[in-house]
């Protein structure tokens, strides 16, 4: 009976309450940030993606949640912008190319440098290891270890292994993000 009441209440809320959240998507170049945005926006994977120059902003609506998503370029010249676009967001999404093990150390260093910024303290982080469909890609446990995620103690942090190409774990990623938009406001 209570479960039925909760479902009815959720349906009623969806009719009248619209939720908004703001996310910043960062990570090294070619990790799949723009591809991720396109997959969650349209469900389409495009093999021929052009690297983001500077930043792109896109609004995506999923159910009663509108997501304002900042996709920031991952080339070295744009990394100084990451902090500015991460201030005040509901969550930071950090994309890692899990199949490019040569860049894991650089990716780890960039993530930890970003999270050391005082103005970003407490903002939840979702680390996504993309390209799990490729041979040799790190799984979640390996990503947590190689990215030294257990050392991050001042905020909630979560890690998923995904494939934008195969659309693996995209739904669970969105669920985590939407849940976070709710928990940050309560």
UniProtKB/Swiss-Prot annotation:
GO terms for molecular function: GTP binding; GTPase activity. SMART domains: ARF, RAB, SAR. Keywords: Cell cycle, Cell division, Cell projection, Chromosome partition, Cytoplasm, Cytoskeleton, Endosome, GTP-binding, Lysosome, Membrane, Mitosis, Nucleotide-binding, Protein transport, Synapse, Transport. One of its GO terms (cellular component) is spindle midzone. SUPFAM superfamilies: P-loop containing nucleoside triphosphate hydrolases (SSF52540). It is found in: Late endosome membrane; Lysosome membrane; Cytoplasm, Cytoskeleton, Spindle; Cell projection, Axon. Residues 1-19 dip into the membrane without crossing it. InterPro entries: Arl8a/8b (IPR044154), P-loop_NTPase (IPR027417), Small_GTP-bd (IPR005225), Small_GTPase_ARF/SAR (IPR006689). It comes from the Eukaryota. Signal peptide: none annotated. Its main location: membrane. Interacts with PLEKHM1. When GTP-bound, interacts with RUFY3 and RUFY4, but not with RUFY1, nor RUFY2. Plays a role in lysosomes motility. In neurons, mediates the anterograde axonal long-range transport of presynaptic lysosome-related vesicles required for presynaptic biogenesis and synaptic function. May play a role in chromosome segregation. This is ADP-ribosylation factor-like protein 8A. The gene is Arl8a.
